[in-house]
From Swiss-Prot:
The keyword Repeat applies. Cross-linked envelope protein of keratinocytes. It is a keratinocyte protein that first appears in the cell cytosol, but ultimately becomes cross-linked to membrane proteins by transglutaminase. All that results in the formation of an insoluble envelope beneath the plasma membrane. Residues 31-85 are annotated as: 7 X 8 AA approximate tandem repeats. Residues 3-29 are annotated as: 2 X 12 AA approximate repeats. GO terms for cellular component: cytoplasm. Pfam families: Cornifin. It is found in: Cytoplasm. This is Cornifin. The gene is SPRP. The modification N-acetylserine is found at S2.
Length: 97
């Protein structure tokens, strides 16, 4: 009977000792690693992305599009319109009558 009692208290103490040693060793290396990777990643990604996209896109698209469309359209519409042809036949018809 006495031999069983001695074995029981001896087996539990070594178990908690091993767990305590492993726990404090795992968290310390993870803590300093997490903030280091997040800090340099966030500011580097948005900085070069924002100024490169809007700068060359906005000024290049509207500049060549606006002046090229209205210029050739305005002079072509009034030119072919037969403004002197309308009064010419009108005068001839009145003279014939």
């Amino acid at each position: 009977m006495s031999s069983q009692q001695q074995k029981q208290p001896c087996t539990p103490p070594p178990q908690p000792q091993q767990q305590q040693v492993k726990q404090p060793c795992q968290p310390p290396p993870q803590e300093p690693c997490v903030p280091k990777t997040k800090e340099p990643c966030h500011p580097k990604v948005p900085e070069p992305c924002q100024p490169k996209v809007p700068e060359p896109c906005q000024p290049k698209v509207p500049e060549p599009c606006h002046p090229k469309v209205p210029e050739p359209c305005q002079p072509k519409v009034p030119e072919p319109c037969p403004s002197p042809v309308i009064p010419a036949p009108a005068q001839q018809k009145t003279k014939q009558k």
